[in-house]
């Protein structure tokens, strides 16, 4: 029974999607320890903080969006809609995640603790943005913009140019793939006055904006290599990333649910893994 409950909660918060969130923050950690001492405890605490913050964000998103989700054929089978998890339990998950997040921050400096409400505010406001702005995808990207600087601030009390560039690359990466994913709901969004770029600009223009966002992502990631003077392994990684982005956008030349899901889940998972590996090898070995 307990295992079934854990499985339901894991599905509710899409725990496996942490694969998208962790690499940018962990890459930031690797860049920081390139110039500072490595600490396994700090690494674990950062991972706990990231996962708990993301859990809060996903739970509160599901809670706030439950009325919209109940009408959307794509989302009406989610756990909160089908009563597999109650609203009370959903709020409890978000509350516990928030407590764990703040406990994990207590080992770091006061600056990151004082700035932490910004992270929570972005997570909390994001679900409402689709009700009033077509830039909702970029508001989601703010989470990834904040994460790398937050890691460095937690460890050093400041943040550097390369960390800011990493956060900015995460912003454009997430904004770009969220625009792609929103194509799945284009008809529903139009009928229900939900704001998204595909519903406003159409599929063709949205794909162009997504592609430009991902080109900027690659440029920013390459710029980190120059700033940090990273070696051959890093540039091989950049080349692979560029190839994966091309593959992702090649998949959505023909728009259908299967291709979009492949582009969103499979390709972005591969991009996340390659990103983390290239930073790990470049900072720890070279």
Identify the function of each model-found stretch.
Residues 1-286:
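Multi-pass alpha-helical membrane architecture of UbiA-family
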